[in-house]
Amino acid sequence: MVLHSKVAIVGAGAVGASTAYALMFKNICTEIIIVDVNPDIVQAQVLDLADAASISHTPIRAGSAEEAGQADIVVITAGAKQREGEPRTKLIERNFRVLQSIIGGMQPIRPDAVILVVANPVDILTHIAKTLSGLPPNQVIGSGTYLDTTRLRVHLGDVFDVNPQSVHAFVLGEHGDSQMIAWEAASIGGQPLTSFPEFAKLDKTAISKAISGKAMEIIRLKGATFYGIGACAADLVHTIMLNRKSVHPVSVYVEKYGATFSMPAKLGWRGVEQIYEVPLTEEEEALLVKSVEALKSVEYSSTKVPEKKVHATSFSKSSC
């Protein structure tokens, strides 16, 4: 039974539209609304997607930030893009203002809503969204390393000649340069990956770089990535809506570390229902801690940016 049915996608760019498109064909939403500061791009995306909606039978329309606040699930894809030569701290500060405007415009947010942050840097923005929204930590999640994990499983599936869905392996930590692969816990058919003869031949450093660098290669060739992350975001919405209780690596607040980063989490209609500890080697644990500590320093400073009272109308004046 579908416990959630109305989804709001905040951000009508390529990622937001790709998410809407992928979600439409799952036929699980009673309604999808798209929200953006640019009315022309919203209208264009809705008109285009409406043609596909006639086949999927999922209603889609433009909506307001206030309406988004009353949706069952809110997917935030809007965010400021990094300017050439801009320090990361400045980008985060600008994205803080964007999120502040978005979430301020959504108030009052329904208390049982689930927010899924897709915009980058996703771990930091998820942490900020948790702080600004006032929702319980389990109801604010980020797409995190879900796409990275998918890429890893596809790669290992090719190496070991199995369906990627039969590969159980996770990319953990930051969705970014410091992310790490939990090799010790990886398995195929219940057999540890480390026990396969092929494992010793793997260039794990090269694989890690290829997984984390794939997005930049796509951006270099065509300017942006959106289909893969759109499909992943739609799948996460699907998991939450149907209360599937599936385990995915998503960006969540982990109390043990006091930070927001990707760990395997069971997802249901309440959002995160359980976070799983992954067995790691000492070396892997050190890499994860290093990744988390780097995020913590930024997450802490980002949530210390002085907050301003934001009204619903201010969202329409922000640049996303």
UniProtKB/Swiss-Prot annotation:
Residues noted as binding substrate in the record, renumbered to the chain: R88, N120, R151
Catalytic activity from the UniProt record: (S)-lactate + NAD(+) = pyruvate + NADH + H(+)
Chain positions recorded as NAD(+) binding sites: N120
Function (record text): Converts pyruvate to lactate.
EC top class, as a word: oxidoreductase
Cellular component GO terms, alphabetical: cytoplasm
Stated name of the protein: L-lactate dehydrogenase A
Cytoplasm among keywords: yes
